[in-house]
Design a protein with these regions (language model features):
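Second-shell loop/turn segments in exported
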Residues: 29-32, 90-100, 115-125
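Bacterial N-terminal signal peptides
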Residues: 7-17
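Stable alpha-helical elements in mature extracytoplasmic
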Residues: 38-41, 91, 103-110, 126, ...
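Activation targets extended, charge/polar-rich intrinsically disordered C-terminal tails
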Residues: 113-217
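Glycine-rich catalytic cores of cysteine/serine-nucleophile enzymes that process amide/ester linkages
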Residues: 24-93
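A short, structured loop/turn motif at beta-sheet edges
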Residues: 50, 97-105
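Sec/Tat signal peptide C-region and signal peptidase I cleavage site
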Residues: 17-24
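Positively charged n-region of N-terminal signal peptides that target proteins for export
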Residues: 1-6
């Protein structure tokens, strides 16, 4: 049986495919353009850190704390935007990246930095909106060609441009949320980490999602 498994792994590698990681957190980038909501970009985090720990299943976006004409006039207070499952199901998953633990930690630090009350929580429609938030996350996981000045108010177009410019670095998804979510299995259970605290800064070995402020959509 073991020789057969080795052969399957070798064939997958020769064909340019990587076998699924046993434990890693995947970041998936999403856009939402349907219904009565404003266009929006956000990302989900799903999986288990390589170093061990509790399963991660969370999502983060960035938006104005309140929607008003003041958005058009200048900076306003911003907040993290945590989408409900129904909102995610009505969105579009564009692409994903399997992160290292260091990248995962950096993304959590980004989320914390943009949390309500922090210096980066100021929302500016022109240069500090939801697209800029996912842009920074994409930068932290090693993607390039992220500066797309004409697309920074167009979440779907922006993410599709990033996908096209990062072939080989990302896993294309391009599926409607409901279908994509249905294709996912359960988040892998933590392996041995429940018996030992994580050694990676910023990763908490509990059953809770990452400890950052949340605001339900």
């Amino acid at each position: 049986m073991r020789p057969l498994l080795r052969l399957i792994a070798l064939l997958c590698l020769c064909a340019g495919y990587a076998l699924p990681a046993q434990a890693a957190v995947t970041i998936t980038f999403w856009s939402h353009e349907l219904g009565n909501s404003f266009p929006h970009a956000f990302f989900t985090l799903r999986g288990v850190p390589d170093a061990g720990g509790a399963p991660v299943d969370a999502n983060f976006g960035f938006t104005a704390k309140s929607v008003s004409p003041a958005l058009l006039m200048g900076p306003v207070a911003g907040k993290l935007d945590i989408a409900r499952p129904t909102y995610i199901a009505g969105s579009d998953a564009q692409f994903s990246v399997v992160m290292t633990d260091a990248q995962y930690t950096a993304v959590l630090q980004l989320v914390d930095a943009w949390s309500e009350g922090k210096p980066d929580s100021v929302y500016r429609l022109g240069d500090h909106n939801c697209v800029h938030f996912v842009q920074e996350a994409a930068r932290l996981v090693g993607l390039s060609a992220l500066d797309q000045p004409k697309l920074m108010k167009k979440p779907r177009s922006y993410l599709k441009a990033v996908l096209a410019d990062n072939a080989g670095r990302v896993t294309p998804v391009e599926m409607h949320g409901k279908a994509y979510l249905a294709s996912l299995g359960p988040v892998a259970p933590a392996i041995a980490a429940a018996q030992a605290p994580s050694t990676v800064p910023g990763i908490v070995a509990t059953t809770a999602t990452p400890p950052v402020p949340v605001a339900a959509r």
